[in-house]
Curated annotation (Swiss-Prot):
GO molecular function, one term: oxidoreductase activity, acting on paired donors, with incorporation or reduction of molecular oxygen
Every Rhodanese domain range: 123-217
Its EC number(s): 1.14.-.-
Function: Catalyzes oxygen-dependent 5-hydroxyuridine (ho5U) modification at position 34 in tRNAs.
PANTHER family (alphabetical): RHODANESE-LIKE DOMAIN-CONTAINING PROTEIN 7-RELATED, THIOSULFATE SULFURTRANSFERASE/RHODANESE-LIKE DOMAIN-CONTAINING PROTEIN 2
Full protein name: tRNA uridine(34) hydroxylase
Reaction equations catalysed: uridine(34) in tRNA + AH2 + O2 = 5-hydroxyuridine(34) in tRNA + A + H2O
Family label: Belongs to the TrhO family.
Cited HAMAP family: TrhO
Superkingdom field: Bacteria
GO biological process per UniProt: tRNA modification
Biological classification of the source: Bacteria, Pseudomonadati, Pseudomonadota, Gammaproteobacteria, Alteromonadales
Length: 327
């Protein structure tokens, strides 16, 4: 059986008429049997899709015929099963949401560092290494000596920079993310804030794992991915983690054996965050999932926003109380 090809792609490029591309792009994906989601915005394209090798090749070839969408940054990995259920092309304000107006990586961006040169850069004691990903991603893997901003979403990253980084003290800053898109936008933001020597890993963690031998690697753990694989190891194969359907946190087999874990309802990370009302909803959703499995169907749907909002609200409350104490 042929492996499913998973293609993560993005490109920051000015697309003033991005709405025009939505329908024909969706048609190309559906005709080729490709599943996954692509985002379109004025600032470019971003997303992860999966299909046969010929289907992915055809998609990239079609995109190359569209103004500005040639030479899209993309990384390929493989899976035994299709990691997505739906085929979607969404129109967005940003292809990766930072929530800061005027940040344009097409105009200002940090220095790209190729995977083969990354180890030397982050081994420099003068370089501050920052992981731009979310807390649940950092939990299962990161680079040696990287700072964890402990952000719940990428929207929180600008505030982390304001509170913790200083262009007069931190002369060299290197950043990384899964595929390169968040750290590219992060470097653009830091440059706008007055940081001079700002670097980011070209192609992200996935490209690093692809090109750097494991015995030479400074990566520790696995890399979280936004599909049903949950995480990939250094060989870019499905890793050891599963995912809690209630809070999206990656979980180990040991955590699944915990009394606090209930399939589709809770895990040790969110057991104290799930309300009785959410629990009822999650139980019903899990019942529908199991019924779908019995019928041989894929159940589509995820209702995790309440738990995520709860996590975010608690973080905001903590920050507020800390600020009040410092006044």
């Amino acid at each position: 059986m042929s492996k499913v090809v998973v293609c993560a792609m993005y490109k920051f490029v000015s697309l003033p008429d991005f709405e025009r591309i939505q329908k024909p792009l969706l048609i190309v994906m559906e005709k080729s049997g490709i599943k996954g989601t692509l985002l379109l915005a004025k600032e470019g394209i971003n997303g992860t899709v999966a299909g046969s090798q010929s289907a992915i090749d055809a998609l990239l070839a079609w995109l190359a015929t569209q103004p500005g969408l040639d030479n899209i940054v993309h990384k390929l990995s493989f899976d035994d099963d299709m990691p997505f259920y739906r085929t979607k092309v969404k129109l967005k304000k940003e292809i990766v949401t930072m929530g800061v107006e005027g940040i344009d990586p097409n105009e200002v961006v940090g220095t790209y560092v190729k995977p083969k040169d990354w180890n030397a850069l982050i081994s420099d004691p003068e370089v501050l290494l920052v992981d731009t990903r979310n807390d649940y991603e950092v939990k299962i893997g990161t680079f040696e000596n990287a700072l964890d901003p402990q952000t719940a979403t990428f929207r929180e990253f600008p505030e982390y920079v304001k509170q913790n980084l200083d262009p007069t003290k931190h002369k060299k800053v290197a950043m990384f993310c899964t595929g390169g898109i968040r750290c590219e936008k992060s470097t653009a933001y830091l440059k706008e804030q007055g940081f001079e020597d700002v670097y980011h890993l070209e192609g992200g963690i996935l490209k690093y794992l692809e090109e750097v031998k494991q015995e030479e690697s400074m990566w520790q753990g696995e890399c979280f991915v936004f599909d049903n694989r949950v995480a990939v190891n250094h060989d870019l194969e499905k890793g050891q983690y599963d995912q809690c359907n209630a809070c999206r946190m990656p979980i180990t087999e040991a955590e699944k054996a915990s009394s606090q874990f209930e399939q589709g309802v809770s895990c040790p990370h969110c057991i104290d965050k799930v309300t009785d009302k959410q629990r009822e909803r999650f139980l019903e959703r899990e019942r529908q999932v199991q019924l779908s499995k019995q019928r041989g169907e894929a159940h589509i749907g995820s209702d995790v926003s309440a738990v995520i909002e709860s996590r975010r609200a608690k973080k905001e409350q903590l920050k507020k109380s800390q600020n009040e104490k410092s006044v």
